[in-house]
Design a protein with these regions (language model features):
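N-terminal, charge-rich interaction modules
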Residues: 2-57
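Flexible, charged surface loops at secondary-structure boundaries
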Residues: 38, 73-77, 124-125
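Compact, glycine-rich, soluble single-domain proteins
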Residues: 51-74
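Short active-site-adjacent helix-start/loop capping segments
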Residues: 52-53, 89-93, 119
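Mid-chain, well-packed structural core segment of small domains
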Residues: 73-109
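A short glycine-rich beta-strand->turn/loop micro-motif centered on a GG-aromatic cluster
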Residues: 107-117
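Glycine-rich, charge-decorated loop segments at or immediately adjacent to ligand/cofactor-binding or catalytic sites
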Residues: 118-124
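A polyampholytic, Gly/Pro-enriched intrinsically disordered region
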Residues: 125-137
Length: 137
């Protein structure tokens, strides 16, 4: 797992006003999300979420998650973002995407999908967290 944080002195009050939905279960090609049901890939954010359709922004495993993929997460006031790389960690997160989030003082976690789920669910209890989750390779 990799994590990039908010610079010292730039912390914000992150008590959740609206909770991010918990991930109930995850396995290869299948996720179950509280209040959203079952799907393959999800965008989750404070107050809700939806299926993550890679074709909307032209996402592919390489070059990976782009700033356009995370814009919606920030629109929902996320101060922490969890990016899953898939079960086999084939989904890349280029430096430009991390930089895009860091410039906006967003804490970023990048991890394999099952680990990303644990990080996200823990954070959902205490902060305005969002995430992109890919449940296959």
């Amino acid at each position: 797992m990799r994590c990039w944080g908010t610079p010292a002195g730039m912390e914000r009050d992150v008590k959740p006003k609206k909770r991010s939905p918990r991930i109930v279960a995850i396995s290869w090609g299948r996720m179950e999300v509280e209040g959203l049901g079952v799907g393959k890939d999800f965008k989750l954010f404070p107050g809700g979420g939806r299926a993550w359709d890679w074709t909307e922004t032209g996402t592919r495993h390489f070059p990976g998650i782009q700033p356009a993929d995370v814009e919606e997460l920030l629109a929902h006031e996320a101060v922490t973002v969890v990016l899953s790389q898939g079960m086999d960690q084939r989904l890349q997160v280029p430096p430009g995407t991390r930089h895009y989030l860091e410039q906006r003082f967003v804490t970023v976690h990048v991890a394999e999908t099952r680990q990303a789920m644990r990080i996200y669910n823990d954070l959902a209890e205490e902060t305005l967290v969002a995430g992109l989750f890919h449940s296959t390779c």
